[in-house]
Amino acid sequence: EDAMFILWKDHSASAEAEEITEKARCFTGGNYLEYSGGLYSAEWYWAKLLHLCRTNPKLAEAAESLVEHCDWITGLLCGDTGPARIARSRCAAGHKALWNTAFGGYPPKEFFKTLDPRLSRFRTGLPGETVTSDKAAGRLCPEWASRLGLPAGIVVGVGLFDAHAAALGAGIRRGTAVKVIGTSSSEMIVVAPEDLRGRAVSGIESQAEGSMIPGLLSLEAGQSAFGDIFAWFRGLLAFPLEGLLSRGLISDGTLDESIEAIIPALSEAASRRSPRDTGPVALDWFNGRRAPFANHRVKAGVSGLGLDTDAPEFFRALVYAAAFGTRAIHEHLRGEGVAVEKVVAVGGIPRKAPFVMQTLADVLNVEVEAPEISHASARGAALLAAVAGGLYPDTETALARFARAAGLEAAGRGYRPFKEARPVIETLYQKYLDLGRFIDYS
């Protein structure tokens, strides 16, 4: 049986995403993938809904609508989760559900009928308008006011995705790529419409109007796995330890401490060594590829292993893979005419993995700023709530105020690239690209 929620990370809808892409390319009524990088993703709204229709038709028949979690939460807080009345956020609809003013909203029912007639019913039930996250969705209902210990009737802002909120919490501005790094990673960028001269950026995840800052276009591209890659490797190395626990040879506490020590130990050992251009090379596609040009069926690969490859060197190859994936995205963006002049990193990884961050700076060949922000998404949500509640006239004013209050201009650590590593990194990056082409076309 299906649960109440569908996780974005689940790629069960890969076939449906590919079908949406093919149907959209053949549809004569308009190019509805124009603002989604030219490809639809298995992580997004319509692919998951189409997959649900085909795998659980009974539930699909009973369902009134599919609601993004960030929209459902605001409805819950306001005391009304009726799908027709929930404020649908520009962020969710614009980045994941094909909503755009150029289309007059969502694609028409005729488009969805080419995929499955049941989708047209869900399309009919969606409101025509979406709301930017600097606006009020409603007011806090008595039930949740009591649960949260807050006054009933205070403003509840329209929701948005965590990475977009984190980018605002990090003080995003034009020319800056905010890299939100955790289990996965997202590159968040804002540009003025005139910067693109009416063009859509191909090969990224999506671009949406005003999903972070009203009046600016928000671009999103990222990696489906980042921290998850290192967690996977840690799990491989921890397997014998878990066997010792089952045989009573090690305690729970000792096991937990030992597992927690694996990544720091690997990082320390790898940081003491100079990289070699004959070492192993890995891909970061452990959970498919988001960008450039999404493909959630591809898998990671590794080449160049030898009997002299030890755990720290293998770990370094995985760290390079994650960094190379970021570089490929940034190079693609620049090739599309998008300025990336500065990189700011927030999330769990920047705060606890200096070796990973230094490698990222070396690979990107730019300084990577890591401000001291422990809860960037919460900070961004608070910023928008302050605008929705009338404390600031607009998002950009709130951004400037929050940046000054938090000292974002000076706080945190900057990772500068080591120039000595450039020749080896360039060789390894070309091998990364070659391995990627081989896996892509295999």
Please state what every model-predicted region is:
Residues G75, K96-A97, A165-G169, S185-I189, ...:
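Short beta-strand scaffold segments in enzyme catalytic cores
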Residues F27-V158, L283-N287, F315, V319:
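Gly/Ser/Thr-rich active-site cleft segment
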Residues A63-L66, G153-V155, G175-V178, S186, ...:
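Beta-sheet entry/capping signal
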Residues E1-E18, K58, D80-G82, G105, ...:
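Glycine/Thr-rich phosphate-binding loops that ligate phosphate moieties of nucleotide
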